[in-house]
Amino acid sequence: MDYEFLRDITGGVKVRMSMGHEVVGHWFNEEVKENLALLDEVEQAARTIKGSERSWQRIGHEYTLWMDGEEVMVRANQMEISGDEMEEGMSYYDEESFSLCGVEDFLQVVKAYREFMQQK
């Protein structure tokens, strides 16, 4: 899972992820938006559920983050739309709407994001 951090012209941090993990970058860009308290919450949840059968979920405005002791799932909330609501011939490009990755890999991105934020 490759990633890149960039600053836009306003100084805001943007995350770009490798193919297949784009939605993780969207989660950082749309839900985190430099809110380190949210990252604290995610890291605390990861510590709490590690080695257990429990899971944790955070539903955001655009994306939902779900994790258990082994993997993290990020999915666009729009995926809740049933097929009946879609126009004929239309479908979602799911690669940018859903992603799975390991908890440790995800936490590495969180750590790198924090470090990049401190470089202001």
UniProtKB/Swiss-Prot annotation:
Domain of life: Bacteria
Disulfide linkage: none
InterPro entries with a match to the protein in the record: UPF0231
Membership in a protein family: Belongs to the UPF0231 family.
Designated name of the protein: UPF0231 protein Ent638_0667
